[in-house]
Amino acid sequence: MKQKRNLKLMKFWRHIVYAISTACFLFFSVGGAQAGLRISDRNSNAYIGLLIPVGPAHYAAIMKKFKKIKSVRVGQFEYQIGSIYKIPVVICIQPFGGEYTRALTAQVMVDHFKIKALLYPGTSGAHIPPGKMHVGDIVIGTKQVNFANFYMSPTGKITPDEFSGKSSLRGYQYFYLNKNLEKYTACAARYVSDREELPSWINGKYKIQKPAIYYYGIQGTSTMWLADKSFIKKTDDVFHEVDEDGDWFSATVAKLAKIPFIEVSTISDSVFEFSGNGVPPRGEHRKTASQITQDISDKIILRVIKTYGYNLLNKKYSYPLRNPYPVSFYRTPTDPRGLIDACQARQRATS
């Protein structure tokens, strides 16, 4: 009898252990599956990332088209999730100024969302005198350079990057825009420029009211704000940048992530046109020059999203390993050289 009772007890506890094991297995399996679903759900939605400069605080053109779904806070940065022209986008307005800060927001964005391209509409200061460049002109970032990354010899000679003249940055010293992306941006810039009329006061005595487009722009990035024309010439002789306040740092984030980076900057000030810090005097006008020019860059990026957003989400665009254009293209950058021929018909169809 005692042996039978022991056998029954053993069977009872065996059932209990089996039930507990099964429950644990199901709990962790379902929990793991749910966690997996949550992670894959977050990563299954592809977005275009939009980097918005903190200044000028003028985002109306973009925000009017943006249909917000929700906000997501990641660390110190807040991201707005939604769509523009039915294209899924993530927007981040950097919390405070500076290229480094914007690149940090870009890195966190790329790490936490499935970003397929980074777009940056900005304003910048001219490094070329009037007659060639004016306030309101549009610069496409065909080449991105960090013109503050140099060695200066005891005699004042500038050598790019390190004093040896050999860059440790390798393929990250300069960035070149993919040729297809160049066409997309050129078409969008031309579409906006054709419909834009600058106020006569914005270019002072020059009275230029139609923005020129630097189709083959060498965009310069640094954390310097230069009003010294002799120093501008010094860096320009080496790096050939046409403007300052580009976003080489965010371009680095994009290339590391193997996604496209498109930057469009509109010239908002020029020490060659105006005295002091080169900012056009606002007078009694409703908008500042920086707000007017930020609007232009925003409209161009909106046009890129509207016309080519689906392509950016679904196609691959590699970075050119070397300069895709002859040096002569950069010497006469306002000549499109057939860049916009194929897209004019498409733009008419989608206007």
Which functions belong to the PLM regions below?
Residues 37-47, 74-348:
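Glycine-rich phosphate- or other oxyanion-binding loops that anchor nucleotides, phosphorylated ligands
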Residues 53-57, 223:
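Short polar catalytic/cofactor-binding loops
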Residues 33-35:
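Boundary at the C-terminal end of the N-terminal hydrophobic targeting segment
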Residues 18-28:
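Bacterial N-terminal signal peptides
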Residues 4-20:
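Bacterial N-terminal signal peptides that target proteins for export
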Residues 1-6, 344-345, 349-350:
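N-terminal amphipathic/basic-hydrophobic helices that include classical n-h-c signal peptides
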Residues 57-68, 72, 77, 93:
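N-terminal carbohydrate-binding/catalytic regions of secreted carbohydrate-active enzymes
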